Amino acid sequence: IRRVARDLAEEVQRITQGLVHTNRVRLDHAATEITLAVRKPSAATVTAARALLAGRGPDQLRSWTEIQARDHLLLAEYPDSLQIPLQIFRIGNLHVAQWPGEIFAETGLELKQAQPRGTLFNISLANGWFGYIPPPRQHALGAYETWPLRNSLLETNAIPKLHSAFNQLIHQLP
């Protein structure tokens, strides 16, 4: 741990030596909301979940299958779509994209690479939590972040739509 701390301190010192202090920096902000569909369980999944959980309360669920079935029942009651808030701040030439969920690293990197003006970094879990928001190709791989439960409820094409909205916000900034 001492070696890591030393390496980190040396890197911070190296970077801060090149910083130029200014007391005047431009601040800008843009925000929007977009509507995304909720991935709801099928009627057959809801029927199977009800049968599995018949007569049992939430404190009686013991297996992952039972917990997942309960989540299917809860998700079935969600609205068909949700309003997703997005914000971007600009501090000088630094842009801060605020995602209301947990994005994958590749998603943040793609938005950074598409940024035409200045530097960009991403903040997840800002202004809400709409679960994991995996890119479309991750859904085919089937990891837990993609399971259609309350922790990953947005449509499979959410990331391209969010990227597009963020790019529009970036271009709205003066």
What are the residue ranges of the model-derived segments?
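Non-catalytic substrate/cofactor recognition surfaces at enzyme active-site rims
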Residues: 1-174
